[in-house]
């Protein structure tokens, strides 16, 4: 999982990326290709 300050560019890497908010943190998840997972930090 990548940890980035800004997720805007990471969201555009794949069309199936979804932005989710869990416990105050923002994540990008991708069920088809999990290597695109990321968290804002």
Swiss-Prot record:
What's the protein here called?
Large ribosomal subunit protein bL36
| A GO MF label | structural constituent of ribosome
Q: Does the keyword Cytoplasm apply?
A: no
Q: State the species of origin.
A: Rhizobium etli (strain ATCC 51251 / DSM 11541 / JCM 21823 / NBRC 15573 / CFN 42)
Give the GO cellular component terms, alphabetically.
ribonucleoprotein complex; ribosome
Does the entry annotate any disulfide bonds, and if so which pairs? Answer: none
Query: Its family?
Result: Belongs to the bacterial ribosomal protein bL36 family.
Q: Which keywords label this protein?
A: Ribonucleoprotein, Ribosomal protein
Biological process terms from the Gene Ontology for this record are: translation
Q: Which InterPro entries does this UniProt record tie to the protein?
A: Ribosomal_bL36 (IPR000473), Ribosomal_bL36_sp (IPR035977), Ribosomal_L36_bact (IPR047621)
Q: Does the keyword Protease apply?
A: no
